[in-house]
From Swiss-Prot:
One of its GO terms (molecular function) is zinc ion binding. PROSITE patterns: ZF_THAP. Keywords: Cell cycle, Coiled coil, DNA-binding, Metal-binding, Nucleus, Transcription, Transcription regulation, Zinc, Zinc-finger. It holds the Pfam family THAP. Residues 139-194 form a coiled coil. SUPFAM superfamilies: Glucocorticoid receptor-like (DNA-binding domain). The keyword Methyltransferase does not apply. InterPro entries: THAP1/10, THAP_Znf, THAP_Znf_sf. It is found in: Nucleus, Nucleoplasm. The gene is thap1-b. The keyword Nucleotide-binding does not apply. It comes from the Eukaryota. DNA-binding transcription regulator that regulates endothelial cell proliferation and G1/S cell-cycle progression. Specifically binds the 5'-[AT]NTNN[GT]GGCA[AGT]-3' core DNA sequence and acts by modulating expression of pRB-E2F cell-cycle target genes. This is THAP domain-containing protein 1 B.
Length: 225
C-alpha cells in the first residue's frame, strides 16, 4: 500500500526519488495523537495504523539531527500547514482575476480642435450624461427646497409681526372705547337730564317744569336725555 499524507489538501505520496518521509500517527500516545488530529484539520477524521503525515508539515526542529531528519522527536507535532492554505487561496484569487471585470467608465478628456487650437468640451457617453443629469437634478432640488423653506420662514415672521401689531391696535381701541364710555357716564352723572344744545350762540336749557317755544329758523343739533 502506497503511503500518502493525511493532511487536508496535501497530495504528497511516497516516492523513493523524493526526499519526503512519512510518519505514522502516535496511536499509542492518545494526547499527542489528538494534537496531530487537530493539526490535519479534517472533520470526523479518525487515524488508523496506516494513516501518516509527510515531513513537509513538520519544522526542522521536530527531527532528530543524528538520524538525518528521518525520525521525529517524541513531542513533535505537525504545524506547517500554511503553505497548502496559501496555495489554495492563491488559486481562488487567480480564478477571480481571470473573470472578466465590468468595464469602468473612462473619464472624458478634452480634445483640441486643430482648426482653431481651442479646447473642445469632452464628449460624454449616455451613461455619463445620465449620471450628470441625476446629480444636477438632486443638487438643484436641494437648493430650491432650501430657498423655499427660507421664503416660508420669512413669510411666517412677517405674519407674526402683523398679528402682533393688530393685537396692539385692538387693545388700544378697547382702552379708548372704555375711556369714552367712562367719560360719557361721568358727563351724564354731572349734567343730569332734560337739556337741549343749539348751534351758535342760541341755546336754552329746558327743565321739567319749563318749556319755551322755539322759532322755526333755529334747529337743535343734539339732544341728550
Amino acid at each position: 500500500m502506497v503511503q500518502s499524507c493525511s493532511a487536508y489538501g496535501c497530495k504528497n505520496r511516497y516516492d523513493k526519488d523524493r526526499p519526503i518521509s512519512f510518519h505514522k500517527f502516535p496511536l499509542k500516545r492518545p494526547l499527542l495523537c489528538k494534537k496531530w488530529e487537530a493539526a490535519v484539520r479534517r472533520a470526523d477524521f479518525k487515524p488508523t495504523k496506516y494513516s501518516s503525515i509527510c515531513s513537509d508539515h513538520f519544522t526542522a526542529d521536530c527531527f532528530k539531527r543524528e538520524c538525518n531528519n528521518k525520525l521525529l522527536k517524541d513531542n513533535a507535532v505537525p504545524t506547517v500547514f500554511a503553505l497548502a492554505e496559501i496555495k489554495k487561496k492563491m488559486g481562488k484569487a487567480v480564478k477571480k482575476e481571470q473573470l472578466p471585470a465590468e468595464l469602468e467608465p473612462v473619464p472624458a478628456v478634452p480634445e483640441v480642435d486643430p482648426a482653431i487650437g481651442l479646447l473642445l468640451p469632452p464628449l460624454y457617453t449616455p451613461s455619463h450624461i445620465a449620471v450628470i443629469c441625476d446629480h444636477n437634478y438632486t443638487v438643484e432640488d436641494t437648493v430650491h427646497q432650501r430657498r423655499r423653506i427660507q421664503q416660508l420662514e420669512e413669510q411666517v415672521d412677517k405674519l407674526r409681526k402683523k398679528l402682533k401689531i393688530a393685537n396692539q391696535k385692538c387693545r388700544r381701541q378697547e382702552r379708548s372705547l372704555e375711556k369714552l364710555e367712562k367719560e360719557v357716564s361721568e358727563y351724564r352723572e354731572a349734567k343730569g337730564s332734560g337739556y337741549v344744545i343749539f348751534p351758535g350762540n342760541y341755546y336754552e336749557v329746558l327743565n321739567e317744569n319749563e318749556y319755551k317755544e322755539l322759532t322755526p329758523e333755529i334747529t337743535y343739533k343734539e339732544i341728550i336725555l
